[in-house]
């Protein structure tokens, strides 16, 4: 999600609450648009209320909000490199969702366009995209950012490794995560954020269809 990259670990949850406040309070939407948010420390947050294991419709890529799942990477990755912890957690949660949904993360998906301003696909047409896709696969936008998209192949491979591990009964700690080369950037220890928290507490908020907000990475499930 386009925004600051300078938040601390203690401030990370407030970034999620800020996204909710903007979506639900400022814009008048019923809930946060993303199904999941991941911070730069690798923490995974539940976004749209309803259960991560359920087919909850989000609102993250206008015209294609049905039959997919939206992951927000908190920060601006057009201007900064996503952390290793963030990349690993995106693959963790996407792989888990792919496994329980019967989706091949390395495959393709055909989605019907409902039409949206800035969409690459007119209303009524079909978009055939990777099963794990980005906002810019659907809309004319820089999102999810140049420093995210250069990791796309890596994330897809690690997502599939996670999905395959779940199907075979392995733990995520058994995985040997693959990294994309990062020129002039020192490598950090590979860590996976395993904490999953709800951004909405016990408040029940009904589902609605709302427009997309720039700055997401959308895992299409």
Where on the chain are the PLM-derived regions?
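Cell wall/extracellular polymer interaction/catalysis modules
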Residues: 1-27
